[in-house]
């Protein structure tokens, strides 16, 4: 496996795997006892959530400029609005609860959830476009991976990374993206092998 190919596998699989691992430890409820860990956990994963947007874009790079832009814009919307959820309902709410102002958390939870929903819907749309493009291009080979990433994106909408459904959703994303990238890479290798290569004739001495 080439280094570039290995890097792309890591790019599509590592962010959801990290979120799944962290999700196992995520408190189900925000309380005074869990507030400090809740806050610190969301600070730690602040740069991880936006990385989920790379996988659907990577899968459509070879499907045309228009699809690349559509998925790119949807990924940007996801990253912007879901980060707001992480900051407000994660870092902000955890900080308020830790400082004894738990009565104010309902406000930041409400704002965060509304903004995060916009981001999650944009993510579902990006995943749907990317998976649909793979099915159109690669037919049945892309169906298992497309189903996995679609399930993962839908679970992400409401379960986020909470255990168990949120963790399952992130694992579905990781496995599905790896499956789809394998299909894309295999098709690229076959296409390259079938492409005629010019043969250079050796110069004949006079």
Protein language model annotation of sequence segments:
Residues 1-200, 205:
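Hydrophobic, aromatic-enriched alpha-helical segments typical of multi-pass transmembrane helices
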């Amino acid at each position: 496996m080439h280094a570039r190919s290995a890097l792309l596998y890591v790019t599509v699989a590592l962010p959801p795997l990290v979120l799944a691992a962290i999700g196992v430890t995520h408190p189900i409820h925000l309380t005074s006892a869990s507030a400090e860990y809740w806050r610190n956990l969301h600070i730690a994963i602040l740069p991880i959530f936006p990385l989920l947007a790379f996988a659907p874009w990577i899968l459509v790079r070879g499907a045309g400029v228009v699809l690349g832009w559509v998925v790119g814009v949807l990924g940007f919307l996801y990253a912007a609005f879901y980060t707001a959820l992480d900051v407000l309902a994660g870092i902000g709410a955890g900080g308020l609860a830790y400082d004894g102002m738990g009565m104010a958390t309902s406000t930041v939870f409400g704002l965060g959830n509304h903004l995060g929903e916009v981001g999650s819907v944009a993510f579902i749309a990006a995943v749907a476009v990317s998976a649909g493009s793979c099915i159109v291009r690669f037919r049945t080979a892309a169906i298992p991976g497309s189903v996995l990433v679609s399930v993962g994106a839908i679970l992400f909408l409401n379960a986020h990374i909470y255990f168990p459904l949120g963790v399952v959703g992130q694992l579905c994303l990781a496995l599905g993206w790896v499956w789809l990238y394998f299909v894309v890479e295999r098709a690229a290798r076959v296409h390259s092998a079938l492409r005629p290569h010019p043969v250079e004739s050796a110069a004949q001495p006079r």
